[in-house]
Amino acid sequence: MSKKGGYKRTGVDVRYGDESVARFINAVMLDGKKDVATKIVYDAFAIIGEKMTEETPLEVYHRAMSNIAPVVEVRSKRVGGATYQIPMEVKPSRRGALAFRWLKQYATKRGGRSMAEKLAAELMDAAGEQGASVKKRDEVHRMADANKAFAHFRF
């Protein structure tokens, strides 16, 4: 048994009551500045609420996350002196973590405006099956599909 107290789960978000939003705020956070990350995410949700009146920002967020999250990915495995890219199913926790990482990465790369505006734009694009983060998911799926022949090497 661990002496360090174990893993502390992230609680639910204060404003939306959603654990996924709380984890996303933690993913956006830089240098431990959680207040700044919270303001960025809430401002992005407010922008989404203004621009997309037919849906709540939380619905747009969840749709975007399901569109970004990869189902399969490739993992390297060395077999007999050769390294193969083996397609494997992604665990749900990693699926969410990859979606958070890609969303933050490609929102940051967008030009100009504030981070909240860039994040809102990337979330709205991802909810509509567009945007760089959805392209990244498609690229990962294409790699897994191209290496389907090596699926029998699974770990």
UniProtKB/Swiss-Prot annotation:
Instruction: Give the GO biological process terms.
Output: translation
The coiled-coil regions, if any, are: none
GO annotation, cellular component aspect = small ribosomal subunit
| Keyword Amino-acid biosynthesis in record | no
Q: Which GO terms describe its molecular function?
A: rRNA binding; structural constituent of ribosome; tRNA binding
Question: Mind listing the UniProt keywords for this protein, alphabetically?
Answer: Ribonucleoprotein, Ribosomal protein, RNA-binding, rRNA-binding, tRNA-binding
- Give the UniProt family note: Belongs to the universal ribosomal protein uS7 family.
Q: What does this protein do?
A: One of the primary rRNA binding proteins, it binds directly to 16S rRNA where it nucleates assembly of the head domain of the 30S subunit. Is located at the subunit interface close to the decoding center, probably blocks exit of the E-site tRNA.
Q: Cross-referenced PANTHER family, in alphabetical order?
A: RIBOSOMAL PROTEIN S7
Complex and partners: Part of the 30S ribosomal subunit. Contacts proteins S9 and S11.
Q: What is this protein called?
A: Small ribosomal subunit protein uS7
Q: Which organism is it from?
A: Chlorobium phaeovibrioides (strain DSM 265 / 1930) (Prosthecochloris vibrioformis (strain DSM 265))
Top-down, what is the taxonomic lineage of the species of origin? Bacteria, Pseudomonadati, Chlorobiota, Chlorobiia, Chlorobiales
